Amino acid sequence: MFVKLLPPEVRKVIAAGEVIESPVDVVKELVENSLDAKATKVEVEIVKGGKRLIRVKDNGTGIHPEDVEKVVLQGATSKIETEKDLMNISTYGFRGEALYSISSVSKFKLRSRFFQEKEGKEIEVEAGNILGTRRVGMPVGTEVEVRDLFFNLPVRRKFLKKEDTERRKVLELIKEYALTNPEVEFTLFSEGRETLKLKKSSLKERVEEVFQTKTEELYAEREGITLRAFVSRNQRQGKYYVFINKRPIQNKNLKEFLRKVFGYKTLVVLYAELPPFMVDFNVHPKKKEVNILKERKFLELVRELAGKEKPIVDIPLSQPVKTYKPTYEILGQMDETFILVKDSEYLYFVDQHLLEERINYEKLKDENLACRISVKAGQKLSEEKIRELIKTWRNLENPHVCPHGRPIYYKIPLREIYEKVGRNY
């Protein structure tokens, strides 16, 4: 038998099948696009579990009208340009396959208004064939409508699960992305009814709202790896969620490891931040699998985190004020943005805005107001103000991250500094 190149239309369907297997895959790709577009509101609507209709609307930055026709082409992406870029991915999407794959196996319509334009542009595609484009009036953002998924692949359509099963999978997916994007409001409609509404909140509030339980917050960092976990013990059934650089990870081995170190009847929501070069998401077309460069050190830090019943604190940040004794030295302000603090082991670079934002949030419980009234980067502080901020920092309930989840400080071991210049510490 002679080897032949497959016709383009056949290759198109095969490629689409690697990325899109069910309605939840469509929702995943579209929600990721919305988040990459900096949306603060994402609305998802499904009918018949997504088999009949999937619609995703957002208020993100939108797509430039010149790019609307490009986004449904294979390999069309604004995220990467070279192979090296694959090692520094900071967005959800990067392959340039999602909209191409979805539009190849559905009746597809996309309308988007770029934030610098006065009107939007709509494109309609059926089974990969562009039917036409037109100008439309709409707010800034993007709306994608996917009808009759796999209408041109009847065999694939037969393998879809029952509507209730597909609906539950979509609901679970929305919760996962809501868990790692608390600053975004998520709404899910099914059969015309609102089934989920999550308004923007702090990360801890979002976790507790999704799971309807109080949690204990844990924190650890080492060698560029930052871990933050929310744990609730004595659950009827253990649940384990892992997010690496804000991306949900489906890894059975890692979840089994969490079961062993945290316990089998524990809710664990683990957030890991790693430098992009340490993580390879380009393992599987669905980006669900991941390779970690320093996996052993990562797991060691997770084990250490699990052994803590209270948040890990590297310096005594939670001493009662009346027994307060300085164990640190304030070195001054750097670039009118960071406060430099040194203790017996570390040099800390403390972000002055994020620190006061956390202080104000713990007083007011309003993250937006806390942000607005806090000192800004680029603002020169008096010595008295610096002392006040650092003293309060040491007594915060959560001294590690701001209400939006950004780290308040970065620390360098003093031993490492001395070793770099060839001195003993």
UniProtKB/Swiss-Prot annotation:
Keyword annotations of the record: DNA damage, DNA repair
SUPFAM superfamilies xrefs: ATPase domain of HSP90 chaperone/DNA topoisomerase II/histidine kinase, DNA mismatch repair protein MutL, Ribosomal protein S5 domain 2-like
Entry's Gene Ontology molecular function annotations: ATP binding; ATP hydrolysis activity; ATP-dependent DNA damage sensor activity; mismatched DNA binding
Pfam families given in the database record: DNA_mis_repair (PF01119), HATPase_c_3 (PF13589), MutL_C (PF08676)
Gene3D superfamilies associated with the record: 3.30.230.10, Histidine kinase-like ATPase, C-terminal domain (3.30.565.10), MutL, C-terminal domain, dimerisation subdomain (3.30.1540.20)
UniProt record, GO biological process: mismatch repair
Gene Ontology cellular-component annotations: mismatch repair complex
Similarity remark: Belongs to the DNA mismatch repair MutL/HexB family.
HAMAP family documented for this protein: DNA_mis_repair
Biological role: This protein is involved in the repair of mismatches in DNA. It is required for dam-dependent methyl-directed DNA mismatch repair. May act as a 'molecular matchmaker', a protein that promotes the formation of a stable complex between two or more DNA-binding proteins in an ATP-dependent manner without itself being part of a final effector complex.
Name recorded for this polypeptide: DNA mismatch repair protein MutL
Native source species: Aquifex aeolicus (strain VF5)
